[in-house]
Structures are given as structure tokens and as C-alpha cells.
Amino acid sequence: MGLKSYSLKSIILFIAILAGIALNHSRAYAAQTKTMVVAGGCFWCVESDFERVRGVIKAVSGFTGGHTENPTYKQVKTGRTGHFEAVQITYDPAKISYESLLKLFIMSIDPTDGGGQFCDRGDSYRTAIFVSNAREKAIAEATIRYAKRTLRRSIRTQILPAARFYVAGPPHQNYYRGTKRVLTRFGIRKQSEAYQAYRKACGRDKRVQRLWGANAPFITH
């Protein structure tokens, strides 16, 4: 009986040690990752683009920058909440820098358009970079200068203080690779098919390629 009790205690202790190691590893990993928030028009598109980037761990669609708490997609689309459609990007700074991510971002949008993006019009589709500190602000300002110098046009993408980020509902997460069948203006399609049809019809890639040429990232054909 004593031997069995000792063995059980040893097993429990071993499991506890493993759990502690796993927890410490998880905390250390979380401490090594960083997040950033950008608004680039349709959040499905921005999420889709950045989840392809090496060093990006995840991209989450949501809303930020407004005055309405816990906004819904329908509320934000009215333009009365002050919120932007935005994406929160979690990344590993050892694999990709904040500066590189911002450069990819600015070259994946039309920063000269202050009224929305591509076929999506209205305040919720405006573009912005949300910064958390002086370093991020300086890098964002340098990115805007780069865009202005490259495009030789006035840049309408805003640099704003980071605000609370509200995660959009499940139907809006990973829409670009969803398998659920939905009714759209293109008929009944799988979400992934509806996304591709929408992106093409909206002219996002054509406009970005026209602006940025060979430097344009994320172009799909």
C-alpha cells in the first residue's frame, strides 16, 4: 500500500512539473510575440493577406478607433460608431519586424484614398495605423513618408493612438478560407469562393498593382 501511494505521488509530482514547464514555456513564448493593429478597408482581405506572411502568428478581424462599446458588424457599417474595420496582427519580432509589416501593409492598400478602399466606401473602410508608443509612431511616420515619396501623392492613411480592439463575430474570422455555404450577390457559394469573387469584383488587387507596380505584395490572380 505504501509503495503504491509513493508511486502515485511521484506520478502526480511528475505531471505537475511538466505542467509547470509547459506554462513557463507558454508565458515565455507570449512575451516574445507582439501585436499591431491596422485598418486597410475590408478586414477579410487584410486578415487573408497577413496570415500568409512568415513570422505572423495570427490575424484577427475586428473593430477599433470608435466610441461605441462592443459594436456589431451592422452597427459599424452604418458609419455612426466611429470604428474602423481593422485587423489585429500577432507576430514574432525575431522573424519579421514591425517596420517590415508596416511596409507590407502600406503597399497592400490605396493610401491615397480617404473615403474608403476600392469598392467599399464610408468611414469604416478608411485606412489607419494604430500605434502604442513613440517608437511605433516614428516607424509609422517613416512609412507614410515612404508612401508619399514613392507615389508622389498626398497620403490619407491616418496614424492614430491604439484603442480598444473589439473582435468581430465568428462569421468574420477566416472568412477567406471558410467552407460554410452562404447567400451572396454572386449566388450561393462557399465562403472561400464568395471571398475570391468579392475581392476580384471590388478591384482591390488591380488598384494596388496599378499604384505599387512590381512591389505590390499579396496580389492574387
Which residues does each predicted region cover?
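Bacterial N-terminal signal peptides
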Residues: 2, 9-22
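Flexible coil/turn and secondary-structure edge motifs
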Residues: 2, 27-221
